[in-house]
């Protein structure tokens, strides 16, 4: 539960920085990832293993996206996704995957609306961190 509190504390600064600077600082993403893992280990080793497997799956998927042409994701998104997947993955790997899916859908809906209103073009970079946080928060609320 303390890891969820830590997530709530860093979610706002992560969102603000990503919206403003299009980056997710290591000083916020790495402690979230490590703190989530340590908290899970202290709470229940079985939960920790489940969360870490979820994290590995999400990180592998996000790394493929970060390395693909055009780099639709940055490495900050990879690290944030890994930390979030540990927390949401406590409730089952499927919930971590739901978190990713909800992130993509919510970000996509927002981007489509912005394109229609001509607030951005297809060439613009979009911060994914806020949508990653929102999608995983929705999955976490549903799972808990």
How does the language model describe each region?
Residues 4-7:
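N-terminal signal-anchor transmembrane helix
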Residues 112-138:
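Interfacial loop-to-transmembrane junctions
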Residues 10-110:
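Functional transmembrane core segments of multi-pass inner-membrane proteins
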Residues 140-144:
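Juxtamembrane boundary at the C-terminal end of a transmembrane helix
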